[in-house]
Amino acid sequence: MFWLLALLAYLLGSLSFAIVLSRLSGSPDPRSSGSGNAGATNMLRLAGRKLAILTLLGDLCKGLLPVLLARVAGLDLHAQAWVGICAVLGHLFPLYFRFKGGKGVATAAGMLMGLYFPAALLAIGAWLLTFYLTRTSSLAALIATPLTLPLLAWREPEALLPISVLTVMIVWRHRNNLRDLFAGRERHF
């Protein structure tokens, strides 16, 4: 059952709401416009608030849904987390879009909502505060993601390894943003 859910999670994660919505609306392809990222923040830049919100909600749901299905199927929290990571991998490397996807932040937040809601609230709150103070989405993601680790280590230790892997994946996908942050070239809102 685990492998079936992991495959379904990857396939669901591969549905890029940013790319689909940009095509349906006639907006520029987010992979080749703006920041080049197929995510909600770039959709805000390219297509406006409405499509950015729809992208965000779609990306959250594709992280949340596989975790909830894994729970209903009787998988333990550790396995649920790995199923959720498969959805994030689908977002990062979407099968349907030549393996060029987003950075996984919203999908990871949806995954966290299903695993341990207080960790998701902590991450979302940290993201919102950092973004409000800096107007920099990538910095907000890089601060918010690892903040969940101590809480999970204390409350849900069986999810710590998969969430640590998730953190590394998200930081890795933001490696160009890190270079730009240190060079003072990162985009702000």
Swiss-Prot record:
Its main location: membrane. It holds the Pfam family G3P_acyltransf. Signal peptide: none annotated. Keywords: Cell inner membrane, Cell membrane, Lipid biosynthesis, Lipid metabolism, Membrane, Phospholipid biosynthesis, Phospholipid metabolism, Transferase, Transmembrane, Transmembrane helix. SMART domains: G3P_acyltransf. It is a multi-pass membrane protein. One of its GO terms (cellular component) is plasma membrane. GO terms for biological process: phospholipid biosynthetic process. It is found in: Cell inner membrane. The keyword Cell inner membrane applies. GO terms for molecular function: acyl-phosphate glycerol-3-phosphate acyltransferase activity. It comes from the Bacteria. It catalyses: an acyl phosphate + sn-glycerol 3-phosphate = a 1-acyl-sn-glycero-3-phosphate + phosphate. InterPro entries: G3P_acylTferase_PlsY (IPR003811). Its EC number is 2.3.1.275. Pathway: Lipid metabolism; phospholipid metabolism. The chain crosses the membrane at residues 1-21, 50-70, 77-97, 111-131, 151-171. Catalyzes the transfer of an acyl group from acyl-phosphate (acyl-PO(4)) to glycerol-3-phosphate (G3P) to form lysophosphatidic acid (LPA). This enzyme utilizes acyl-phosphate as fatty acyl donor, but not acyl-CoA or acyl-ACP. Belongs to the PlsY family. HAMAP family: PlsY. Probably interacts with PlsX. PANTHER family: GLYCEROL-3-PHOSPHATE ACYLTRANSFERASE-RELATED, INNER MEMBRANE PROTEIN YGIH. This is Glycerol-3-phosphate acyltransferase. It comes from Pseudomonas putida (strain ATCC 700007 / DSM 6899 / JCM 31910 / BCRC 17059 / LMG 24140 / F1). The gene is plsY.
